[in-house]
Amino acid sequence: MYDVQDIKVYRNVLVLLEPLQRLASLIPRSDSRLKIQLLNAGRSVPAQIAEGFAKRRSQKEYRRFLEMAIGSSDETITHLRIIQLAHFPQVKIETCAALIKQFTIISKQLNKYIQAVSKNIPRSDI
């Protein structure tokens, strides 16, 4: 039986949540709202993929959730860029840059996955 964990982009984004959490823990308490927004956006990417997967009987509904996942990935990138610009003493710019690169890859993978879903191509390797 096909499971959401069979989807490569889903597995890839789950791996990024730990370094995202580590980075968020370095954000000063005075910017706790930014920390919460970063974590909420990052965590919503796999959640939206999973929710869409559960509704995959309707291709339109599935695509809608995947498109929301791209939006959340892009929102995560924006929060990471804001963190870079804030120059928090404990946060390394290189760490932000690496996560930005990885979430950019996630957004691209999701876009390819949406194209595959639209064409009914087997999707486990995307």
Where are these regions (language model features)?
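Short, C-terminally biased terminal segments at protein or domain edges
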Residues: 1-49, 56-126
